[in-house]
Amino acid sequence: MTDGLWVIPASVLRNLSDKLYEKRKNAALELEGIVKQLAVAGDHEKISAVINLLSSEFTASPQANHRKGGLIGLAAATVGLTSEAAQHLEQIVPPVLKAFSDQDGRVRYYACEALYNIAKVVRGDFIIFFNKIFDALCKLSADSDANVQSAAHLLDRLVKDIVTESDQFSIEEFIPLLRERMNVLNPYVRQFLVGWITVLDSVPDIDMLGFLPDFLDGLFNMLSDSSHEIRQQADSALSEFLQEIKNSPSVDYGRMAEILVQRAVSPDEFTRLTAITWINEFVKLGGDQLVPYYADILGAILPCISDKEEKIRVVARETNEELRGIKTDPAEGFDVRAILLISKRELSSEWELTRIEALHWISSLLVKHRDEVRDQL
């Protein structure tokens, strides 16, 4: 096997880890030229040896300047490889990703810069590493070093551009990672996540709406964030999805209804209003699809009828009337017993309006389903 030390002149390797940036930069340019010649000659064994040397002797070095030099070198090698770079990505990208968690802020900065330069060369070919890159960027978005945050932001923009133009991106593989990250409370990470949701939703070939139940609760969670900007971004994303739901013939109302019912009793007013507004639209749009969830929906609506916020009371009353107006049949899954239990429970409510509406429901059930109700009373 070829040794990279025989391929790269000692002076280049020495300057690659020099403390002076100019020397490192010039060494990288020389390295790029050497790799370019090897690529033209088709000598991929020597190219692999060079990449291996940069990874093992530089990016894995205990010395920070060596690690920086290794990152610069890997980016330079990729630039030198140009169209041949894709076949070496399995060697090139992992050490750069590892450097994202380096204790030295400058090394993390150089890792962002290196991956940026690598991504510019290989474009869509690096999509195979997307989840790992996304995970790294997610953490770097909240980095303690402002320079690292800035570099990560530039890289993030490039990655978004590449993903939106790529036909290799797998939304199915990405969603579990997104779902896992949605519970993070850090404001920078939350902005990062909403930014990605918005960008992916704007791509015609990516069906984010189909996966909305996987991250809907996370978006609702952001509505009560202490940052006005994050609340606004989450609200904007939710508004866009609700509009898409109105225009979509097939939506999984059930899974989302479960989430909305939980959020309708949130201590945060804005979250309650948004949840009850969604429930209102779902009742209008979903109709009989929501029959199995009627009791849960009613359980969320009745307390909101007496909410201290007038906007919430208005929407809750309207939703209550919509719900009562839908034709129901126990044979189609309408659970008379569950509706009755909710209504009886709300008879003990401290709020008069809620108690009155609960009585209306019991009266309505007696008219439409007398036998079933009498068995339960």
Model-based region annotation:
Residues 4-13, 41-58, 85-100, 126-141, ...:
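HEAT/HEAT-like alpha-solenoid repeats
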